[in-house]
Amino acid sequence: LPNHLHLPWTIKALEAGKHVLCEKPIGMNAAEAKQLFEATKKYPDLKVMEAFMYRFHPQWKEVKSWISEGKIGDIKTIQSVFTYFNADPDNIRNKAGIGGGGLLDIGCYCISASRYLLEAEPTKVYGEIELDPDFNTDRMASGILTFPKATATFTCSTQASPEQHLKVFGTEGFIEMEIPFNPLENSCTISLKKNGEEIESKVMQANHYTLQGDAFSKVILNNEPVPTSLEDALSNMRVIDAVFESSKNQSPVRL
C-alpha cells in the first residue's frame, strides 16, 4: 500500500479484529503515528507492529553484540547511506500526495538504525532536502542527529547510484556494515577494525522478512509484546518530521 493508506487500513484491520504487521513508515507523519497509537488502546488484545525488517537480520544481532561488549568503546558517531535511482513518474515513490519521497521510503531506515544502535533518542535534528522539480518529492535528504552522547549523520536519495552502508565509530574502533538494510539474496560481511587489526564476520544469507514474520507470529501465539513497539514507531516519525521542518526553516529542530 502507498504510505497514505497505512493508517486507515491498519485501523480498519483492527476494527475487524485482526493483528497488523504494517509496512514502514507507520504513517505519513508523527500525527498519524500518534493517532494509531491512541487507536490501539481500544484493542488491547491485538498486536500492531511497524515492519522494519532489517532488525531481524542476524547481522544486526552481531553488531549489537559487538557494541554491548564494548569492542569499539563508546559510540561517538554513526554514518549511514541508502540510495537508489527511480525516476518513474508512475511509481508511488514519486507521488508527493500519497507519501512519496526518499525520507519516508529509505531515510527512515537510517534514522531507525541510529536510534536502535544508540538506544537513545536525538535531542536536536538538522536536515537538508532537495525536491524533485517535477514530482515535488524529496529526491535527496541528509540529516545530522544529535544524541545525548553521540551524533548520527545520514543521506538518502531516490535519484542517485544505488548504494547502502553504515559505519559505527567508537572511541576504540569502528564497525562497518556493507549491506545493512536489505541483503536479501546474498551473504554479507560486517567488519570490526581496532588497533590496526580487522575482524571480518561473514553472515550467511537470511530472509529477514521471513524472520520478521516468524517473530510477529510468535508474539501473537504467546501473547508477548511486539519487538518493535508503536512508541518506537512514533519516535522515528518525530525525527522524520524534524528533518522536513529543519530543511524548510533552515534551522535545527530541538526535540
Where do the protein language model's features map onto the residues?
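Contiguous beta-strand/loop segments that form the cofactor/metal-binding neighborhood of enzyme cores
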Residues: 111-184, 203, 213-224
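Short polybasic amphipathic segments
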Residues: 166, 185-195
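Predominantly a Rossmann-like dinucleotide-binding segment in NAD(P)-dependent oxidoreductases
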Residues: 46, 54-134, 250
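Hydrophobic residues in well-ordered beta-strands that form the structural core
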Residues: 22, 48-50, 177
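A short glycine-threonine-serine/GTX helix/turn-capping micro-motif
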Residues: 98-104, 199-207
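C-terminal helix-rich "cap/oligomerization" subdomain common to oxidoreductases
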Residues: 217-255
